[in-house]
Amino acid sequence: MAYAVIRIRGRVGVRRDIADTLKMLRLHKVNHCVIIPETETFKGMLQKVKDYVTWGEIDKDTLVKLILKRGRLPGNKKVNPEIIKELTGMDVEELAEKIINGEIKLKETPLKPVFRLHPPRKGFERGGIKKPFSVGGALGYRGEKINELLEKMM
């Protein structure tokens, strides 16, 4: 399984250790998204930055859409299925399946590891960006509902 992690809050007033963890996750700016494997190391990092990001399990269909719509190659070149087939030797669905299953990491592909997303259409949840998802906000773990947020942000 793989997590999609999206940075929600900015960098003003962030403690140094949390800023370092966000940097290790490659979440430098708001609305940036990374796909990470579900390991104990990453889970600990997510717990540390839970007040600045939201995350959940991404499904294959959403990852395919994310790669095709917001994926970029070095030089900020757009991605299409033919380019992915040519560079990786597999189609987009197969690539997404392997990323989700943890067989390959996104950084091992020619794609950039960070997806730059738009702010969500119709905004975040009613509670805003300072409350956890469990009480109606936007932060922290949200499970399968990350796919709905990603759809709003693509």
Curated annotation (Swiss-Prot):
It holds the Pfam family Ribosomal_L30. The keyword Protease does not apply. Signal peptide: none annotated. GO terms for cellular component: cytosolic large ribosomal subunit. GO terms for molecular function: RNA binding; structural constituent of ribosome. GO terms for biological process: maturation of LSU-rRNA from tricistronic rRNA transcript (SSU-rRNA, 5.8S rRNA, LSU-rRNA); translation. The keyword Ribosomal protein applies. InterPro entries: Ribo_uL30_ferredoxin-like_sf, Ribosomal_uL30, Ribosomal_uL30_arc, Ribosomal_uL30_CS, Ribosomal_uL30_euk_arc, Ribosomal_uL30_ferredoxin-like. It comes from the Archaea. Keywords: Ribonucleoprotein, Ribosomal protein. Belongs to the universal ribosomal protein uL30 family. HAMAP family: Ribosomal_uL30_A (MF_01371_A). Part of the 50S ribosomal subunit. This is Large ribosomal subunit protein uL30.
